[in-house]
Amino acid sequence: MTSNMRAGLITLLTIAVIAPAAMANERFTASAIKEEIIGKRIYLAVPFGGEFPLNYRPNGQVDGSGEALGLGRFAKPNDKGRWWINGDRLCQQFTSWYKGAPMCFELIRTGDKRLKWIRDNGETGTARIGNSI
């Protein structure tokens, strides 16, 4: 292997390792939200284990189901509402959940298809980006 090939390989490997790390802790912009969140199923990590799926549909509807987590025993297991983007924040409002109150979230990339959310009331959590719906 020539020194030019070796230098090129080292550069390529360095980029492959550094690029994902550079993306971590990057705030989602409005365009990134549209591109990477809208039209996808987002899985919210829940404190007692498992994941809570929310579907952000391209038509502005958001819906979710907590049936797999057994939420029907405690609250309405399914709900739907609407989503919108305000600045660089993803906002949503459900029909019943959270008493129908609107809420907005700042999204921060923490890795490949992983994010941290910060709600406008200061609550935080994590989620993963699933497949297209």
Predicted regions and their residues:
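Short N-terminal leader segment in a subset of presequences, especially plant chloroplast
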Residues: 9-12, 34
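Bacterial N-terminal signal peptides that target proteins for export
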Residues: 1-10
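Hydrophobic core
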Residues: 13-21
